[in-house]
Amino acid sequence: MFLPADKSDEVDLAKTYDAIVVGSGAGGGMAAHVLTSHGMQVLLLEAGKKLNINQELKSMEWPYDHPRRGDMPPDSHALSGREYTIRQPPYAQASPYKHVYSYIEDGNGSDYAKDIVVDEKDHPYTGTPYAWVRARCLGGKTNIWGRLALRLSDCDFKAASRDGFGEDWPISYADISPYYDKVDLYLGISGHKENLPYLPDSLFQRAVRLNPAEVKLRESLAKTGRVLTPYRAGVTTDGLKHNKYRVHCYGRGACDRRVGGCDIHAAFDSPTGLIYPALETGNLTLRTNATVAEVTVDKDTGKASGVSFIDTDTGKSYTAKGRSVLLAASTLESARLLLLSKSSLYPNGIGNSSGHVGHNFCEHLMGPGVYGLNKELVGKPRTLDDGRPGSFYVPRYRNLTDRSSKFLRGYGFEGGSGAGMFPDNAYSTPGFGSSYKKTVRDYGGAFIGMGGFGEVLPRYENYVELDPDVKDRWGVPVLRFHIKFGDNEKKMAADMADSAREMFEDAGIQVLSVTREILTEGYSIHELGTARMGSDPKKSVVNQFQQSHDVKNLLVVDGSTHVSASCQNPTWTIMALCWRSCDHLAEELKKGNV
C-alpha cells in the first residue's frame, strides 16, 4: 500500500486557476481527475479535514481491541431512527450531549466514523423531518458509501415519456454509456452480466459469490422472470494496475459490520481512486478545511470569477479566482451554495433565473422489506460472508412493460444472507453457555433478508430554501427543508412489502417478519435533483453538460442535476456525468467559448 505524502498546498490567492472544484466526493474527485488529465490547473476545495482513513476505519480490528467495542464515548450521541420521526430539526438543539451525529453512527462500530460525518451541533438545519447524513472530510461520503454501483437506462432517462410524469432527461443512455465504461475501467466494479435492458451491464471484474441461500432465492425468482444478481459493487476484485493506492478485495474486512468504508481501498473512495492520482500530475492544488460560502461574480461579464471560502479552523475568509467553477458539494449543499450566492446580477441566487434551484428534490424511499429463515440450512457448515462488499441485488420489475394501476415507477431490493461476526439471532436467542452458543452457530447462517429502494418522484413542492434566522457555527445560513413523501411513495412502499413476502414464500423461505414502515425522508442518503438539467432554461438549472443556463462557466457536477431518481443507486451515474461534462468543459475552454 502506497500513501502519498501530504501534497496539499496553500492556495495561491493571486493566481487564476483554470477551474475551482468545490467538494471532494464522487463528483469533486472525478472533476479533479478529469480536468488535471487535460492539463488544467485545478484548485480543489474541501470543507472538512484530511483524514488517515486507514486509521479511522480499522476494518481488520476485532471489536474487543477498541475502546467500548466501537461504541460512542459517553459525551456523544448518534440519532436513532425514531428520533427523526418524533422530533423536528434541528435535532441537536437542547441535546445534553457534547456531540450529536446522524443515524449512520448508530450501530456496531459507531465510533469508527465519528471524524467523517458532521457534528449536528455545528451543522444544524430546520424545517420538516429529514435524516441528513453529511460527511466533511477529504473524499466525503465515498469513505463510507454502501458500494452498490448501478447504471441507469433509457427506462430512467425517458421515464416521463413513458408514464407522463415530470420531465425527461436531456440525454439518453447512448450519450452516457461510454463514460460509464470509463468509470468501470478506471475505478473497478464487480458483478455478473444479466443482459437486462433496464439495468445495463458494466465492464465487470470478478463477481461476489452468492451463498446457498441466495442461490435458492435466485432460482426461485427466475421462474417468475425476475432476477437476483450478485451485488454490483464499486470494488476492484481483480486489482487495478494503473493505481498504486488500491489493492484488490480479499474478502477479509468488516464490510458488513461497519458504517462502510474500506481501509485497503479495494472499494472505491475518492481520495485513493481519484484525488491522489490527480495530485501526482502536478496540476492539482488541494485545500482542506475550506468551507465555500459564495460563488463570486464578475459584474462586467456576469460570469463566475471564483469563490469565497472560510477556513474552518480560524474562521478567516479568503477569495480564490478561477476561469471556471464546478460545484460538487452534494445535492443539498450545492443548492445551498447557489442560493447563498446572491448579487445585483443574481438576486435569487446564482444560476437561479428559473426559480428551480432547491426544487424538484427526489431520492429513494427505504424501510419496507422481509426477513426469513432457510430451515434446511440450520446446522449446516457456515460460509464466510462477513468480508463480502455486498450480497445480492434484485432489479426493478414493476412498470417495465405493463403499467401498474397503483403507482408510477419502480423499486429494487438489496439483501443478503450468511454468517457474520454478529449472527442475527445472537441477541434474541434464549439460553446461556454451550447450548446457547451452539444454537446461535447452527442458525447463524440460515437467515436471509432484503430491503427495498424505491423511486421518489421529483416534485417542485419538495424543496429546500435558506433559513432566514438560523446559521451554522461559521455564521452561514442553513437550509430549511420542505420535503415529504407523497401518495405514490406510500402505495409503492405497500407493494414493496407485499411483494417481498411473496418472493420469500414462493422460494420456501420461512417469513419471520415483514417491515412496512417507511423510514424518514433522507434515510437513503441518495438526495438528488435540486439543480436539475434540462433543455428549457425556464424549467431547469443546467444543460446536458451540467453547465448553468445563466452562467456559462459555472457547472454543477453532483447529484443536484439528476432529473429523476430512478431506483438505482446514483454514485456511478454522478461520476459518469461528471466525466462527460469535464471533457466538454476542457474543450470549450480551449476554444474560448467559456
Labelled PLM ranges:
Residues 19-44:
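N-terminal Rossmann-like FAD-binding beta1-loop-alpha1 element of flavoenzymes
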Residues 37, 41, 47-72, 281, ...:
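Glycine-rich loop(s) and the adjacent beta-strand/alpha-helix scaffold that form part
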Residues 68-131, 136, 141-151, 156, ...:
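Conserved redox-cofactor binding core of oxidoreductases
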Residues 101-141, 169-173, 354-479, 487, ...:
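FAD cofactor-binding and catalytic pocket of flavoenzymes
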Residues 230-237, 246-255, 293-296, 445-456, ...:
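A glycine-rich dinucleotide-binding beta-alpha-beta segment and adjacent secondary-structure elements
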